[in-house]
Amino acid sequence: MNYRVLHLADLERFLELRMEFLLSYQNVPKDFRNITENYLRKHMETEDLLLLAAEEEGSLVAACMVCFYETCPMVDNPSGKYGELRNVYTKPAYRRKGISEKLVGMALEKAKERGVTKMRLHYTDDGLPLYQKIGFVPEERYMEKDL
């Protein structure tokens, strides 16, 4: 298994895996793949997005992404630098082999290298045990509103 950072040359293979992930638990609008592709083309080679993958024999079998952003310093995060872990997904045939755990570990290390001091994520029920094992704790006082 080869673990690595993805680049624009990997875009199509990453998009296939991301769409497989999203479709595994929700309906996805018809144009969502194009919207995602446009976003990735704009951000993949910048400092505000990192894509990691596990690859076996030329096929992506797992991947995740981290979106980076900075806010005003907070008491619990004086740097104000955050990473948001997104779309950790492993193909079903490769699950329960520690692949996602290794990818998340890589994401955390890469985030630290960028000065990030707090990582956030939204989790599925399937992913909760992994994130708790790694040391993530649920944050109860979080809200959002569609605009």
Each predicted region: which residue ranges?
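A short beta-loop-alpha structural element at the N-terminal edge
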Residues: 2-16
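Conserved acetyl-CoA-binding loop-helix of GNAT-fold acetyltransferases
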Residues: 87-90, 96-109, 113, 133-134
